[in-house]
């Protein structure tokens, strides 16, 4: 009598090795499923016949389904027509677009893996390209819904593990985050500007020593000054003609998604309606174009969240920082405390000054009277000009040299209409402003609420039953 048997398949074995090998076969697994269904087991020959029959049916189905193109979503009557379609120009173009779409998805997933610290060594580029081609290749299937998605998933996994970084380029671990690089660039610009300002001040101080010169020398100086003005104008024009930095978001593109608008105002309206993005103190905004351009560089080049700024984690792609701002509801500017100095060059708060006259153009230079009356303050050591400007003493120059942020040209006249249109959109959405009568009404309502709360607390404490000195029993037994 055989010692080693299989009760499910009803067979016997000579040794334990053959028995263990039998337990790993498909025949044994098939009989186990039949046993669960209370069906009789099949023999090895019967199982092989069933396998061959199933393979024949699968081949028949594959032949019939080979006339469907998954890329173009078209069905063909014959296999020859299907092969001719694969060589057509339209199919090649659609296949190329599919390859680009897969590449974009792979790069986005690799960026997420990189942020999570899942980057690994790269693999062969040929293997990666083969995986992408396999993912988008027109595989025959019965219908688009029944097309097996396994190859695409495998291809994405292969490419994601293979690249482990930004698409086809591997990120150097020693490379600085884009946010830090952008901050360093801004610091260099600020230092360069401070050096230029200090040089101009030194030239002004040197010019205080007056000397008698001839008329010819005066003409030469005038010519030199004219040439300097021309050179400065040319330099300004060159700076204006310089394009935006690489990766910066244009002023017609949304800062929080991939939406593109035909104009700046439509872009601002889109960000307000779809992302609830409001520009703070917009009634004092003087350069809306410059502000949106600066924010585009901050998000596109520096990969910086507008609310987190230097805090929070670093991002290595524009899509990642946009997704963060949308998910965390950070589609707003952080202007608390000293952070507001970052955007000071785009605002003009002169209209909020107490000595500002209504209807006065802040850009228009005041006409000086014929009689020059100058005032001097001994305490502050300042000379007050008729225009209201204050001139400090030379001994306090170290304090006047301080610079807070980059200085930019203010263009109120060019942006007044644009700011007005944005204000109309804000008011249409229920915005009441952060200053003026609306702010006073809000403060009054807060005061009324506080007084009401105090009165209710006082009344409740006065009528509280626990403060009764003598308690009368309500129930008598």
UniProtKB/Swiss-Prot annotation:
<keyword id="KW-0479">Metal-binding</keyword>
<keyword id="KW-0007">Acetylation</keyword>
<dbReference type="GO" id="GO:0042273">
    <property type="term" value="P:ribosomal large subunit biogenesis"/>
</dbReference>
<dbReference type="GO" id="GO:0043065">
    <property type="term" value="P:positive regulation of apoptotic process"/>
</dbReference>
<dbReference type="InterPro" id="IPR022755">
    <property type="entry name" value="Znf_C2H2_jaz"/>
</dbReference>
<dbReference type="InterPro" id="IPR036236">
    <property type="entry name" value="Znf_C2H2_sf"/>
</dbReference>
<feature type="compositionally biased region" description="Basic and acidic residues">
    <location>
        <begin position="167"/>
        <end position="178"/>
    </location>
</feature>
<comment type="function">
    <text>Pre-60S-associated cytoplasmic factor involved in the cytoplasmic maturation of the 60S subunit.</text>
</comment>
<feature type="zinc finger region" description="U1-type 1">
    <location>
        <begin position="4"/>
        <end position="28"/>
    </location>
</feature>
<comment type="subunit">
    <text>Homo- and heterodimer. Associates with pre-60S ribosomal particles. Interacts with MELK and MYBL2. Interacts with DNAJC21.</text>
</comment>
<feature type="region of interest" description="Disordered">
    <location>
        <begin position="135"/>
        <end position="212"/>
    </location>
</feature>
<feature type="modified residue" description="N-acetylalanine">
    <location>
        <position position="2"/>
    </location>
</feature>
<dbReference type="GO" id="GO:0043410">
    <property type="term" value="P:positive regulation of MAPK cascade"/>
</dbReference>
<keyword id="KW-0832">Ubl conjugation</keyword>
<feature type="modified residue" description="Phosphoserine">
    <location>
        <position position="276"/>
    </location>
</feature>
<feature type="compositionally biased region" description="Acidic residues">
    <location>
        <begin position="196"/>
        <end position="212"/>
    </location>
</feature>
<dbReference type="GO" id="GO:0033674">
    <property type="term" value="P:positive regulation of kinase activity"/>
</dbReference>
<dbReference type="GO" id="GO:0005794">
    <property type="term" value="C:Golgi apparatus"/>
</dbReference>
<dbReference type="GO" id="GO:0008270">
    <property type="term" value="F:zinc ion binding"/>
</dbReference>
<keyword id="KW-0539">Nucleus</keyword>
<dbReference type="InterPro" id="IPR013087">
    <property type="entry name" value="Znf_C2H2_type"/>
</dbReference>
<dbReference type="InterPro" id="IPR040025">
    <property type="entry name" value="Znf622/Rei1/Reh1"/>
</dbReference>
<keyword id="KW-0963">Cytoplasm</keyword>
<dbReference type="GO" id="GO:0030687">
    <property type="term" value="C:preribosome, large subunit precursor"/>
</dbReference>
<keyword id="KW-0677">Repeat</keyword>
<feature type="zinc finger region" description="U1-type 2">
    <location>
        <begin position="67"/>
        <end position="91"/>
    </location>
</feature>
<keyword id="KW-0690">Ribosome biogenesis</keyword>
<dbReference type="GO" id="GO:0046330">
    <property type="term" value="P:positive regulation of JNK cascade"/>
</dbReference>
<keyword id="KW-0597">Phosphoprotein</keyword>
<dbReference type="GO" id="GO:0003723">
    <property type="term" value="F:RNA binding"/>
</dbReference>
<dbReference type="GO" id="GO:0008631">
    <property type="term" value="P:intrinsic apoptotic signaling pathway in response to oxidative stress"/>
</dbReference>
<protein>
    <recommendedName>
        <fullName>Cytoplasmic 60S subunit biogenesis factor ZNF622</fullName>
    </recommendedName>
</protein>
<dbReference type="GO" id="GO:1990275">
    <property type="term" value="F:preribosome binding"/>
</dbReference>
<comment type="similarity">
    <text>Belongs to the REI1 family.</text>
</comment>
<keyword id="KW-0863">Zinc-finger</keyword>
<dbReference type="Pfam" id="PF12171">
    <property type="entry name" value="zf-C2H2_jaz"/>
</dbReference>
<dbReference type="InterPro" id="IPR003604">
    <property type="entry name" value="Matrin/U1-like-C_Znf_C2H2"/>
</dbReference>
<dbReference type="GO" id="GO:0005829">
    <property type="term" value="C:cytosol"/>
</dbReference>
<keyword id="KW-0862">Zinc</keyword>
<dbReference type="InterPro" id="IPR041661">
    <property type="entry name" value="ZN622/Rei1/Reh1_Znf-C2H2"/>
</dbReference>
<dbReference type="Pfam" id="PF12756">
    <property type="entry name" value="zf-C2H2_2"/>
</dbReference>
<dbReference type="GO" id="GO:0005730">
    <property type="term" value="C:nucleolus"/>
</dbReference>
């Amino acid at each position: 009598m055989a010692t080693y048997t299989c009760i499910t398949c009803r067979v016997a074995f000579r040794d334990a090795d053959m028995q263990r090998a039998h337990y790993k076969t498909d025949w044994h697994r098939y009989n186990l499923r039949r046993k669960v269904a209370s069906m009789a087991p099949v023999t090895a020959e019967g199982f092989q016949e069933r396998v061959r029959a199933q393979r024949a049916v699968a081949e028949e189905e594959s032949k019939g389904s080979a006339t469907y193109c998954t890329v173009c979503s078209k069905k063909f009557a014959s296999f020859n027509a299907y092969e001719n379609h694969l060589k057509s120009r339209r199919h090649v173009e659609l296949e190329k677009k599919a390859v680009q779409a897969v590449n974009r998805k792979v790069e986005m997933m690799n960026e997420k893996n990189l942020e999570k610290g899942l980057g690994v060594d790269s693999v062969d580029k040929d293997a990666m390209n083969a995986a992408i081609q396999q993912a988008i290749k027109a595989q025959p299937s019965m219908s688009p819904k029944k097309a097996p998605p396994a190859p695409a998933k495998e291809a994405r996994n292969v490419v994601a593990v293979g690249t482990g970084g930004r698409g086809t380029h591997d990120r150097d671990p020693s490379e600085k985050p884009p946010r830090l690089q952008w901050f360093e660039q801004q610091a260099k610009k600020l230092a360069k500007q401070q050096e230029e300002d200090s040089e101009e001040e030194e030239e002004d101080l040197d010019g205080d020593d007056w000397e008698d010169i001839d008329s010819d020398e005066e003409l030469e100086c005038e010519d030199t000054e004219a040439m300097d003005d021309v050179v400065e104008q040319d330099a300004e024009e060159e700076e204006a003609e310089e394009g935006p930095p690489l990766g910066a978001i244009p002023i017609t593109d949304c800062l929080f998604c991939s939406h593109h608008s035909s104009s700046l105002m439509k872009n601002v309206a889109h960000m307000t309606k779809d992302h609830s993005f409001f520009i703070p103190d917009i009634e004092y905004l003087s350069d809306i174009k410059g502000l949106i351009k600066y924010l585009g560089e901050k998000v596109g080049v520096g990969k910086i969240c507008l609310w987190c700024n230097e805090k929070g984690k670093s991002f290595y792609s524009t899509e990642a920082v946009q997704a963060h701002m949308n998910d965390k509801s950070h589609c707003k500017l952080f202007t608390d405390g000293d952070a507001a100095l970052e955007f000071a060059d785009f605002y003009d708060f002169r209209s909020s000054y107490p000595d500002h006259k209504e209807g006065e153009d802040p850009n228009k230079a005041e006409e000086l009277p014929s009689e020059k009356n100058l005032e001097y303050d001994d305490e502050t050591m300042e000379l007050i000009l008729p225009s209201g400007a204050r001139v400090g003493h030379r001994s306090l120059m170290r304090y006047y040299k301080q610079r807070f942020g980059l200085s930019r040209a203010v263009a109120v006249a060019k942006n007044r209409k644009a700011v007005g249109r944005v204000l109309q959109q804000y008011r249409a959405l229920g915005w009441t402003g952060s200053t003026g009568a609306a702010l006073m009404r809000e403060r009054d309502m807060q005061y009324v609420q506080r007084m009401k709360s105090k009165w209710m607390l006082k009344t409740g404490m006065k009528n509280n039953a626990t403060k009764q000195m003598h308690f009368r029993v309500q129930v008598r037994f």
